[in-house]
């Protein structure tokens, strides 16, 4: 019984650590998003409303819209899109961003999908 109690107690600690790491990773990803110029097209909140967005055809993706992810909306798919870019769009390839940073960017972008859903109340 003491062993079971210890196992259950330690599991809770690991979950808290995982939540903190995910939040920290997302915050780092957001900083990378700004620093690498993603916000110029996608906007600071990833809504596709950056300063140059209106001049781009097709317009930049609104990361809240799950249907707009053409190559998948998971971390690996987003990371690969960052690396390779999107053909026939203004989205360039970013192969110079190291894989660990691309992953952090992808975690941030993925987090935008669940923060808000598109509805009639948002503009």
Q: Which residues does each PLM region occupy?
A:
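Electrostatic cytochrome c docking/interface patches
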Residues: 12-34, 71, 119-123
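Extracytoplasmic electron-transfer domains, predominantly the class I c-type cytochrome c fold
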Residues: 56-110
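Detector for the c-type heme attachment site
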Residues: 12-13, 41-48, 83, 110-111
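Sequence/structural segment immediately N-terminal to covalent heme-attachment motifs in c-type
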Residues: 23-47, 53
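Surface-exposed patches in mature extracellular/periplasmic domains of secreted proteins
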Residues: 92-95, 116-121
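Sec-dependent signal peptide recognition
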Residues: 1-2
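Conserved loop-to-helix junction within protein kinase catalytic domains, corresponding to the end
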Residues: 54-56, 121
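C-terminal motif of bacterial Sec signal peptides marking the signal peptidase cleavage site
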Residues: 7-10
